[in-house]
Amino acid sequence: MKLRISLLVILISMLFASCGISTGKGTEQKEEEISVLRYDKLLNEYVRSNSFSAMQKLTMDYRQPTKILIEDVLAIGTVKDDTIFQRLQKFYSDTTLVRLVSDVEAKFPNLDEVEKGLNKGFRKLKKEVPGTKVPFVYSQISAFNESIILVDTLLGISLDKYMGEDYPLYKRFYYDYQCLSLIHISEPT
């Protein structure tokens, strides 16, 4: 009889666990929070310091954003090319891009406000469209090529396209009317 009761308790426990029924003790999973990976800082660490650990993270941990940046956004080659990381380093060593990277780091020391906005937006979206998957969000510097990258479950934000309409480098590459759309990322539209 004790064996049956023990088995019954184990089966009921397994049933509750597999069905996700909460016991009310705070074991339920928190809603998914968005945290923006500072891919731009990781890439800059590689470019400026020739950091092997940063290169490993780019190629192993963040393979997809690296492939998208190199092949689609910058179009400087393929990730399979043996010299692609030297080419990437040379590309971002251009004096204009060095200034751009420095300005982006000064303007966006952290992305707390962006993360708050993304979390608020995705909470609203999930209410309207249940089952919506939250993408992996990262920041990058696209050399003025793209504003937003959206591929599968990735969302890339090119911070260099959100420096504010009066940003001096925009004047060199864009017409005045184009600069109007290059607002600071935390400004309301």
PLM features per residue range, with description:
Residues 133-140:
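Surface-exposed patches in mature extracellular/periplasmic domains of secreted proteins
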Residues 181-189:
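Residue-level detector of conserved catalytic or cofactor/ligand-binding positions
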Residues 46-47, 125, 185:
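Terminal targeting/pro-maturation regions of precursor/exported proteins
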Residues 59, 82-83, 95, 147, ...:
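Coil residues (strongly favoring Ser/Thr
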Residues 145-182:
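Hydrophobic alpha-helical segments and helix pairs
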Residues 63-132:
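Post-signal peptide N-terminal segment of secreted/secretory-pathway proteins
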Residues 1-32:
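Bacterial Sec-dependent N-terminal signal peptides
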